[in-house]
Swiss-Prot record:
Catalytic reaction equation(s): 2 (2R)-3-phosphoglycerate + 2 H(+) = D-ribulose 1,5-bisphosphate + CO2 + H2O; D-ribulose 1,5-bisphosphate + O2 = 2-phosphoglycolate + (2R)-3-phosphoglycerate + 2 H(+)
Modified residues (N6-carboxylysine): 191
Oligomer and partners: Heterohexadecamer of 8 large chains and 8 small chains; disulfide-linked. The disulfide link is formed within the large subunit homodimers.
Record EC number: 4.1.1.39
Top-level taxon in the UniProt lineage: Eukaryota
Keywords, ordered alphabetically: Calvin cycle, Carbon dioxide fixation, Chloroplast, Disulfide bond, Lyase, Magnesium, Metal-binding, Methylation, Monooxygenase, Oxidoreductase, Photorespiration, Photosynthesis, Plastid
A single GO BP: reductive pentose-phosphate cycle
Sites of N6,N6,N6-trimethyllysine modification: 4
Residues noted as binding substrate in the record, renumbered to the chain: 113, 163, 167, 285, 317, 369
Native source species: Pinguicula caerulea (Blueflower butterwort)
Family: Belongs to the RuBisCO large chain family. Type I subfamily.
Protein name as annotated: Ribulose bisphosphate carboxylase large chain
Active site residues of this protein: 165 (proton acceptor), 284 (proton acceptor)
Length: 466
């Protein structure tokens, strides 16, 4: 029969350096740290086996199927520069291993079991190449960047947002009041914090009602379309959809979901509902650092970002870049492009291991939020460009005169930066001067500049921003 019981080395079956990848394969780049004494070929083959058809011993039922057709293959291994005992192992998976339109199944297969594997000291999924044949089975973002701009009638600049603080403890009425002040002052959006769901001090239905009132009042006063990210995340999918239905009945433009804590199945369900009912979907990445913070173990955020674009979301938080190290800036911009663009070339300097073709799947707006204020505006405008959402929580609500003047300061700073850029001025070199000039005409901006002036404006021109 040719069946021989016993344990055999993975590399005999799953390490195939001669393999030529197919256009339909899902390709993965793993950072593998083998246990002492385990050769990299065996470690890479073990990853390929455990995340596809393999098990720890030979089983007679292998003879009932065609392993060559279904097995994952480790087809290339390269050492990580500057690290000892770390390797990038490239694995190709046949498309038939995955259920169509299911990010959940894709992750269960590729990262579900293999991370606890004894032969590995650590394992990190650095990147995935999703083939067009698989992408075409996903709806993707409910609307995408262009449709969102058309819905909001806002063009030629980044959108402005603000997370309402304190995030927990306000009553629904006071929460709605804070929303109204920010929107009236000139912001496009305000936001529920990721952990605002339906707590005893503020039940979700009350919050939705008062926020809708704030939206309609501020729209009437400013003549602009406004929105508030109403967090629909809940303990069950049914409850989540119930909240989204109520938001739609109120006529508001956008809802929100925590896609990692809520899960990909719930997220994809909500994204389908949002497309069918004309709601935009804002995605928060709460819990991402548990998965992506360690350099040698876990999943890099660029993979989670790709998964979100497949599962569906119109905005996603993607870090701020400002004040960070140069290398992190390039890597952040790498996955920002993966979210927005239709076609992204392989570029290892930006952490992009594979060329990715999104075949017309709508793009996702990256959201910069966390510790930013008016002095960062030139840097953010230059780095992120027009297709982004800039969110100032404390940078709006921390204004000495209140929320509405804080919103005015941010809007004036943004309009000044966009105008300066359109006139051909160098935001990197002249950023501070541009903000100072604008503050002469805006007492609100002048007050904001004074409050945050001791925080340095750390931004040098970067050549790799094209």
């Amino acid at each position: 029969v040719g069946f021989k019981a016993g344990v055999k080395e993975y590399k005999l079956t799953y390490y195939t350096p001669e393999y030529e990848t197919k256009d339909t394969d899902i390709l993965a780049a793993f950072r593998v740290t083998p246990q002492p004494g385990v050769p990299p070929e065996e470690a890479g083959a073990a990853v390929a086996a455990e995340s596809s058809t393999g098990t720890w011993t030979t089983v007679w039922t292998d003879g009932l199927t065609s392993l060559d057709r279904y097995k994952g293959r480790c087809y290339n291994i390269e050492p990580v520069p500057g690290e000892t005992d770390q390797y990038i192992c490239y694995v190709a998976y046949p498309l038939d291993l995955f259920e169509e339109g299911s990010v959940t199944n894709m992750f269960t297969s590729i990262v579900g079991n293999v991370f606890g594997f004894k032969a590995l000291r650590a394992l990190r999924l650095e990147d995935l190449r999703i083939p067009p044949a698989y992408i075409k089975t996903f709806q993707g973002p409910p609307h995408g960047i262009q449709v969102e701009r058309d819905k909001l009638n806002k063009y030629g600049r980044p959108l402005l947002g603000c997370t309402i603080k304190p995030k927990l403890g306000l009553s629904a009425k006071n929460y709605g009041r804070a929303v109204y002040e920010c929107l009236r002052g000139g912001l496009d959006f305000t936001k529920d914090d990721e952990n605002v769901n339906s707590q005893p001090f503020m039940r979700w239905r009350d919050r939705f009602l008062f926020c809708a009132e704030a939206i309609y009042k501020s729209q009437a006063e400013t003549g602009e379309i406004k929105g508030h990210y109403l967090n629909a995340t809940a303990g069950t999918c049914e409850e989540m959809i119930k909240r989204a239905v109520f938001a739609r009945e109120l006529g508001v433009p956008i809802v929100m979901h925590d896609y990692l804590t809520g899960g990909f199945t719930a997220n994809t369900s909500l994204a389908h509902y949002c497309r069918d009912n004309g709601l935009l979907l804002h995605i928060h990445r709460a819990m991402h650092a548990v998965i992506d913070r360690q350099k040698n173990h876990g999943i890099h955020f660029r993979v989670l970002a790709k998964a979100l674009r497949m599962s569906g979301g119109d905005h996603i938080h993607s870090g701020t870049v400002v004040g960070k190290l140069e290398g992190e800036r390039d890597i952040t911009l790498g996955f920002v492009d993966l979210l927005r663009d239709d076609f992204i070339e392989e570029d290892r300097s930006r952490g992009i291991y594979f060329t990715q073709d999104w075949v017309s799947l709508p793009g996702v707006l990256p959201v910069a939020s966390g510790g930013i204020h008016v002095w960062h505006m030139p840097a953010l405008t230059e780095i992120f460009g027009d297709d982004s959402v800039l969110q100032f929580g404390g940078g709006t609500l921390g204004h000495p005169w209140g929320n509405a003047p804080g919103a005015v300061a941010n809007r004036v700073a943004l309009e000044a930066c966009v105008q300066a850029r359109n006139e051909g001025r160098d935001l990197a070199a002249e950023g501070n001067a541009i903000i100072r000039e604008a503050s002469k005409w805006s007492p609100e901006l002048a007050a904001a500049c004074e409050v945050w002036k001791e925080i340095k404006f750390e931004f040098k021109a970067v050549d790799t921003l094209d």
